[in-house]
Amino acid sequence: METPLEAAFYCMGIIILVPLPLLFRFLLSLCNQCCFLMTYMRLLLAILQLSLVSFVYAQDAGLERWMMEIDDRVAVSSLSIPGAHDAATGEGLHSLPGFGVTQSLDIKSLWESGVRAFDLRPAVKDTLLYIYHGRLRTTVSFSEALGIICAQLERYPSEFAIVLLREESDSENESERSLWPHLVGKAIQEIGNKAAVFSPDMKVADARGKVLFLTRNAYNGMERGALLAGWNHSKDGNANAQIISSRNGEVARLQVQDYYAPTNAKKRLEKVEAVKHYLLLASKAPEGVWTINFLSGYSTTWLGCTPLATTSGYKRNAAWLHPLVLEGMENGKHPMGIVFMDYAGVDRVDGGLWHWKPFNVYGRELVRTVIESNSVPAE
């Protein structure tokens, strides 16, 4: 959340600090005849280099606990929260390379980059619950993913997380599908009071230190999170979907956009317009109306017809869409809702198996922009 003055100091710091190690290396060469001076200069050089690294990394300091600045009385529905689509793919996949990866950071690193909403899609393999993306199994189990998030909540109790759940049933047989409600319910029960109770007008104070589960599929023992109804993948989304409290059946209106396959020029235009439209809806939504807006998608086709979820396709989508969305994010403080994206927390990624040039995806800038749109805390 840099002011112009902070940005100026940052530039001055780079200008001043970067040449200093070079200067000291030159002076060091003049001191070779004196053992004491040489040792002293080496020590000074090491300190300066460490200071430079610390200075640069300090620009992201605070993102691991950015919610500390949000007033307790603010409604969760009125926040701007960066999210990671298929968040566990950054942990690695048990599959052929080149397919299905939507993140380059693991879950812990996503948290540290400012992400607070995690799209996790458990599926049963034999009798165990792993996170999947379609038919592709990640290297992390559902319980392990929750453990990583809960560890961050222990470390940063001012924060909370939102976990968006969906059964990724493509890889499951009938027997495995029958186990899903029980295994998901059991994993959530194991985190105890860290699971937040949903209400349409819940405040930040109600959520701090907890995980809010919003699920597209019911599971056993649902008492704290909420069930989503009316989800679709059309270019228009659904501005009248519902979030239904598991505790008492209270219903909140949900505005949701998840148009995930912009595989030609017409569909790409539809995608960017849909994202911007739901950003506008979020900015005007009254308290208690929730917004989930997916920037994610893939843009690769096979022989011009069948869409394929290649890793390069997700990168390509992020590279063209994220700059357009950033241009449309007006300056000022206004709600954006929960904004799910690919390659959150990083600005540049390698091209991968299907594309040799790197992609500029602006995921770090996008996360920061979403966070910075939150209102200034009350005095």
Which residue stretches match the model-derived regions?
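Long, acidic (Asp/Glu-rich), low-complexity accessory segments flanking structured domains
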Residues: 59-113, 126-156, 160, 295-379
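Cysteine-centered motifs
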Residues: 11, 31-35
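Surface-exposed substrate-engagement region within the catalytic domains
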Residues: 194-333
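Hydrophobic faces of well-ordered beta-strands that scaffold small-molecule active sites
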Residues: 118-120, 161, 213
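Conserved, mostly hydrophobic/aromatic
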Residues: 121, 163, 339
